[in-house]
Amino acid sequence: MLIVVSPAKTLDYESPLATDLSTQPDFIADSEELIHVCRKLTPLDISSLMKVSDKIASLNAIRFEEWSPIFTSDNSRQALFAFKGDVYTGLDAASFSDDDFDYAQRHLRMLSGLYGLLKPLDLMQPYRLEMGTKLANDRGANLYQFWGNKITEKLNAAIEEQGDKTLINLASNEYFKAVKPALLNADVITPIFKDCKNGQYKIISFYAKKARGLMARFIIENRIATIEELKRFAVDGYYFVSAESSEKELMFKREEQFK
């Protein structure tokens, strides 16, 4: 099965790397095209477009300016280590074995506004450009129009390479909108994670993001190959709820967390 996850806003270019192995992104020319668009933006433009502080806007103006189509260990690091958000806390790639990295490279993909689709060990230069950003470009009014069918076609290639026709959607709605399920040569299965809060089960963003990372790790670490095996996911107190699941959605719940 192939797993897709969202990227993270928070980045880490300081922590030690668990492997020196790296690969090149597939869409460098497309990324460079977007960078040329972004370089025309002032920090004020960036702040308004991305709804970020002046400090973050200025930082990203510098990042756009310094971005290079040549990816090296000096200006980049592997995407799996560069992203540092709740999903990646759950994934905990720093503790992967060499075999885990090899498996992840074939079975995990990260969606990205700037890079389109990343393999775990693809080198990545720092950036901030969320998929939902309404960045006008030569291909359309936003990044969904910019990427068109490219991400889906690359996913189809990865699906073909890894050998079965199942895609596990652990990405957010904002990012999965960049994928066109009707054109995918795979069944899309979307796990849903609900936590109990004040007696009601609901999707709590922080917990759900971390759970997506935990499930991605579970699949990678245990070489999960079937949906029946995936239903056995029982990490951090989550359990499968058959009565609230369907062919396309798998429901997992967890009792209230008291700190």
From Swiss-Prot:
It comes from the Bacteria. Coiled coil: none annotated. GO terms for cellular component: cytosol. InterPro entries: YaaA (IPR005583). One of its GO terms (biological process) is response to hydroperoxide. NCBIfam families: PRK02101.1-1 (NF002541), PRK02101.1-3 (NF002542). Belongs to the UPF0246 family. This is UPF0246 protein VSAL_I2547. It comes from Aliivibrio salmonicida (strain LFI1238).
